[in-house]
From Swiss-Prot:
Widely expressed in the embryo and in adult tissues. Higher expression is observed in the brain, testes, ovary, skin, and kidney. GO terms for biological process: poly(A)+ mRNA export from nucleus; protein import into nucleus; transcription-dependent tethering of RNA polymerase II gene DNA at nuclear periphery. Residues 1-26 are annotated as: Disordered. Involved in poly(A)+ RNA transport. Involved in nephrogenesis. InterPro entries: Nucleoporin_Nup133/Nup155_C, Nucleoporin_Nup133/Nup155_N, Nup133-like, WD40/YVTN_repeat-like_dom_sf. This is Nuclear pore complex protein Nup133.
């Protein structure tokens, strides 16, 4: 199926059929498609088809239809002169008629095998100097023709020069009416019975007349109404937009068709396609569509687009329309095309399907180039070929002429027929006409009468030439180098060659011998696993042979096929057909593997130095076929670019092109290497960017390269996706190797590398120099390429997830994340927000999405992403992103709808969650968070102090129960009291110790004591020593610290300071109490008394105190001990 070109142009107008009596000349057999003869048992047939085989055919049974012919028919055939033109028409109603010279014989076909008394009338046609044909006769009835009695059936016949004879009732062959039509000197070519018992008569030059008879049997005629539909009268310029056109003077009509089901009349002419809706008394033209140039362009593309001189060929191609039939997909037009410059000049028969539409479009047209390609002789010979479509819902089609019937398909639906030419070549035999009867294709053989062609159940699933090639590869060339006509016996093939043996089993399967195929498979690869080690290699090789097959039956390849003949040969002259046949063969192979149980037994094969599941490698082959078909279609649109790239690819691979082949022939043969074109296309693009500074010149190359690579990769991905079930892994299979699709291959020439290179080329060399319109297209194309690259990573990661390879998965995921960011960030920087968003959303690049929303200040889009990607924790990612970027204000100012999500996130981030709690006025929760954080803070003094203060404030603002409230506040106050000891450290001391009040660490009670009583605290007074003593209460018994020793150390430090500063200067005769009155020690005692501390229990024993190291030097001074004991005793008595 081919998409048509949309570019209009001037078409070559075809000459009409000439009307003189013509002798029938034999059509030479086609070059390539001789039918194979094989004695294959035919299936059972309905009673209307006799079991007698008329001609031999490989895929079809050709058998007599119905009972024997009426005597008058056989008599007319026997008595016919050599110059008499004989033609037959068969209608679905069961009626048939034969024109033999100037005799018209009408009969009802009996569909039973037993001859019964049937209706048969012999009518005399008006004399004419021109030869009659069955197309100039039609029958009508007021009721259904298949049930109508003979009395109600009327017959109308028109001579080529316009003399009309009308029989009102077939029961009275001698009663008729005649009139003469004025056709302006032109010959008539078709008669069609339409509604209301009337008839349409057409001429080669476009005269359309409607004839009807009154009650007396008198004929009346008038021209068919032209352009009288609802769009008529609106002006020629406007009406052309809707497909309504005027009729030119030199119109040539090729076919006229009446479709009873829709009551529509169609005319195919040199002006295009016209359509009328017909009722009992009038007709309305509803369509006149210029199809000729579109059809010609589409056919030309389909056949010659790979030729290097395509533009020259296109100007000289001739297309001739031959016939037209209805189908559910639209009107099917039979056309023949030839190029006089070809050697040899071949006529290509094509089936063009025109889907109907109110406003027709070229997109509704498809072309199927059949494999019936005889040598071109003359237009007159081509016009002898007609078309039969037995079932409107099926693509099955039959072409026929006097020599043969060719089975094929319209290409407009699934299924179809095996293409085969069925020759009626016995002496004196000719095919005189045909039609459809009882839903079967029925043809009139001069020797055998009516025959039906039925597809055999044993017909091979493979394309015909692929079937022959398979036989050749199994058994080697036959005596004359031709393929074997039947599969060889197993003992004819070397037993050790499992590839050949499995090919033979495949061949048997394709010929519907499933039992024989299964038996051979079981013998080659028993289910117990013996011999299965080679299974993956053998299957892979067979499929590779299919996709890389040499078209050995193409005459141009005759001298270029390897001698061993181990491949599958193809015969099509058209590259696209070769690729399509390879795809059909691949699908047959997959069906064979599935039904014989081999598919589930496949394991893995080494590809590109890595193991891959064999079933996925088979899928890869089909993907490359899909990509090759796309590339072939692009070859027609960009011949110069693709041809140059192909030549470069062949040169890189050191592949020679034989003189009788084009580089395209050689390149498209080896489908498995189709991806080698990508690098070569980029080379051409880079060359264009360097050589042509003008964007108008290099822009076309860049866009074309993007389109080609994009469409090829998308075709491969689409096949992989739509056919995934065919290549699925069996249930409970062991873990498979990592899957690296060919569309994600790295390294030199790998698709991933190619796309990365193209990304860099476009953004560096093309985008900066392009205008706005070109930039938009470039970005759209680039995004499609990046989509392919990223989807390859996803496929890889998915395979690793299934295989349980966590370490490799993590490594690849990091690579994927980094690559994704590298590819998308430049587009984001260029402001291509729409395309960036599309990719980032598809591949969940949350970082890019957040950056995009931040750049555009689009908070609503962020909220949408939170909903869209809720199951992937987008909200957590966003909140974390805000934290990492220091955007805590934005984090804490989220809309109310996200408060719950934010609260959940902040549970793991207590340092921020309390702010959110305050924002939502949950003060109790905020207090709890701050209180816990304060208790856990052991590093920074100022932080702990701040947390305690905030915790106190939130506690005061909260509505917690009173007992809890009081307990929490008391604890906070107590902690603040302890912190006050550190906060009131002397400034001079802090500077001495190089401690910054804002960043100093949180000090322990022991550290604080040491600081207060250290020598560096030169200005220490009773308050400092009293704070040190107060800090002793923060030591718990379980800490293992000797509090009494610390107390002695504090007092000893105070005493040593006193001795140094004042006591040492006192006289022994001084009053000890007066001498110590201003000392630090005494002031400490006074403060303890003020605080009602029991000195008796609190003060350390004097003996223990004097043993302190700090007082070691004072032990030898009696006055010191005297002063100490005197003050001890005095203050103990004072407290009593």
């Amino acid at each position: 199926m081919f998409s048509p070109r949309g570019t209009p142009g001037s078409g070559r107008r075809q000459a009409p059929r000439t009307g003189g009596r013509r002798s029938v000349s034999a059509v030479q057999p086609g070059l390539l498609f001789s039918p194979r003869r094989s004695a294959v048992t035919a299936r059972s047939t309905p009673t209307r088809v006799q079991s007698h085989a008329v001609v031999e055919s490989y895929n079809f049974d050709v058998q007599t239809f119905g009972s024997s012919l009426p005597v008058k028919v056989m008599e007319a055939l026997t008595m016919a002169d050599v110059d008499d033109q004989i033609s037959v028409k068969v209608e679905a109603s069961g009626w048939a008629w034969m024109v033999c010279g100037e005799r018209l014989i009408v009969w009802k076909v009996s569909q039973t095998s037993v001859a019964k008394l049937s209706v048969c009338k012999d009518l005399q046609l008006p004399s004419s100097e021109f030869a009659y044909s069955a197309d100039l006769v039609s029958i009508s009835s007021s009721g259904p023709l298949d049930l109508a009695p003979i009395q109600s059936i009327s017959v109308l016949a028109v001579s080529p020069d316009g003399l009309v004879r009308f029989w009102p009732s077939l029961a009275h062959e001698g009663s008729y009416t005649e009139i003469s039509l004025d056709l302006s000197g032109h010959l008539s070519n078709y008669v069609a019975a339409v509604k209301g018992g009337s008839f349409i008569v057409s001429s080669y030059r476009g005269h359309l007349l409607r004839l009807s008879a009154d009650s007396s049997g008198k004929l009346h005629h008038r021209p068919v109404q032209q352009g009288q539909g609802m769009l008529s009268g609106i002006g020629r310029r406007v009406s052309s937009l809707f497909g309504i056109r005027g009729q030119p003077a030199d119109l040539s009509v090729f076919s006229v068709l009446w479709v009873k089901a829709s009551s529509c009349l169609y005319s195919l002419s040199s002006c295009g396609l016209s359509k009328w809706e017909v009722d009992e008394n009038s007709e309305t033209q509803v369509l006149s569509w210029s199809t000729n140039q579109i059809i010609t362009d589409s056919i030309t593309d389909a056949i010659w687009d790979s030729e290097s001189n395509y533009s020259e060929i296109k100007k000289g191609v001739n297309v001739l329309y031959l016939d037209m039939q209805p189908s559910n997909a639209g009107l099917v037009v039979l056309a023949a095309a030839w190029y006089p410059g070809d050697t040899p000049c071949v006529a290509y028969f094509c089936l063009v399907t025109l889907a109907e539409s109110i406003v027709p479009s070229p997109d509704l047209l498809t072309v199927e180039v059949t494999k019936y390609n005889p040598p071109f002789q003359s237009e007159e010979e081509l016009l002898k070929t007609r078309l039969v479509l037995p079932d409107p819902s099926s693509p099955a089609a039959y072409l026929y002429n006097e020599e043969l019937v060719f089975a094929c398909s319209t290409g407009a639906g699934r299924g179809g027929l095996a293409e085969e030419k069925i020759l009626f070549s016995s002496p004196g035999d000719r095919v005189r006409g045909g039609g459809v009867c009882a839903d079967l294709p029925v043809f009139f053989s001069q020797n055998s009468g009516l025959v039906a062609v039925l597809a055999r159940e044993t017909a091979s699933l493979l394309p015909e030439t692929m079937e022959d090639s398979l036989c050749t590869s199994v058994a080697g060339p036959g005596p004359e180098g031709t393929p074997l006509e039947t599969p060889p016996k197993i003992d004819m093939v070397a037993q050790e060659d499992k590839t050949k043996l499995l090919k033979q089993a495949f061949l048997q399967f394709c010929r519907h011998d499933l039992v024989g195929a299964q038996s051979m498979v079981d013998e080659l690869f028993p289910s117990d696993g013996e011999g299965s080690a080679d299974l993956d290699t053998v299957v892979t090789q067979i499929d590779l042979d299919l996709v890389d097959d040499y078209p050995a039956c193409d005459p141009r390849w005759a001298e270029s096929v390897p001698d061993e003949g181990a491949g599958f040969t193809l015969t099509s002259l058209i590259l696209l057909h070769q690729l399509e046949d390879k795809m059909k063969a691949h699908r047959c192979l997959m069906d064979f593997l599935l039904q014989t149980g081999l598919l589930d037994r496949l394991t893995s094969t080494k590809v590109r130095s890595c193991p891959m599941a064999t079933r996925l490698l088979l899928c890869e082959h089909a993907e490359k076929l899909s990509a090759a078909i796309v590339l072939k279609n692009h070859h027609a649109k960009h011949p110069e670019l693709v041809n140059t790239a192909i030549q470069t690819a062949l040169k890189k691979n050191s592949t020679d092109t034989p003189t009788n082949l084009t580089p395209a022939d050689v390149f498209f043969r080896e489908v498995s290497q189709i991806s080698s074109i990508f690098e070569c296309l980029l080379d051409e693009e880079e060359k264009a960017l360097k050589e042509h500074p003008d964007a108008a010149r290099w822009g076309e190359v860049v866009l074309s390269v993007n389109d080609i690579i994009k469409d090829m990769l998308q075709a491969a991905a689409q096949y992989r996706e739509t056919k995934a079930s065919l290549y699925r892994a069996p249930e409970n299979c062991s873990p498979e190797p990592e899957y690296i699709p060919w569309t994600a291959s790295g390294g030199v020439g790998g698709v991933r590398s190619v796309i990365s290179r193209q990304h860099e080329l476009i953004l560096r060399a093309a985008y900066p120099h392009a205008d706005a319109e070109l930039r938009s297209v470039l970005c759209e194309q680039l995004v499609a390429l990046l989509d392919s690259l990223l989807s390859g990573y996803v496929a890889q990661l998915t395979s690793l997830r299934r295989g349980g390879q966590q370490e490799r998965y993590d490594t690849l995921e990091n690579e994927y994340t980094q690559k994704r960011s590298e590819l998308l960030k430049p587009l984001l920087e260029l402001g291509q927000h729409q395309w960036v968003a599309a990719l980032a959303e598809k591949y969940c690049d949350f970082d890019i999405l957040v950056q995009l929303c931040e750049r555009t200040d689009n908070q609503s889009r962020l909220q949408q992403y939170m909903v869209k990607f809720a199951d992937q924790n987008f909200a957590d990612f966003l909140f974390r992103w805000y934290m990492e970027k220091g955007k805590r204000g934005k984090l804490l100012s989220q809309p109310m709808a996200t408060h719950q999500q934010l609260a959940s996130f902040l549970q793991a981030h207590d340092h921020l969650s309390w702010l959110h709690d305050i924002h939502v006025q949950d003060y109790q929760r905020a207090h709890r968070t701050l209180y816990n954080q304060a208790n856990m803070e052991t590093r920074y003094f100022s932080k702990k102090k701040t947390l305690l203060a905030l915790s106190k404030l939130t506690a005061l603002a909260s509505d917690m129960p009173e007992p809890v409230h009081r307990r929490q506040l008391n604890d906070i106050v107590e902690q603040e009291r302890f912190l006050l000891h550190q906060e009131t450290l002397p400034k001079q001391l802090l500077e001495e110790k190089q401690l910054n009040p804002d960043s100093m660490p949180l000090l322990s009670p022991q550290n604080l004591i040491s600081l207060y009583i250290c020598d560096e605290n030169r200005g220490a007074n009773e308050y400092d020593f009293k704070k040190a003593l107060d800090l002793l209460e923060y030591f718990e018994e379980e800490n293992g610290i000797d509090v009494d020793a610390l107390k002695r150390e504090i007092f000893s430090k105070a005493l040593k300071k006193d001795w140094k500063e004042s006591w040492s200067s006192s006289d022994d005769n001084d009053d000890p109490l007066e001498a110590a009155r201003d000392s630090t020690f005494v002031k400490i005692l006074q403060k303890l008394i003020q605080e009602r501390v029991s000195l008796q229990t609190y003060l350390p024993d004097i003996k223990d105190l004097l043993q302190e190291d700090e007082l070691e030097s004072l032990k030898s001074k009696p006055y010191f001990e005297f002063l100490l004991r005197a003050n001890y005793e005095h203050y103990l008595k004072v407290q009593i």
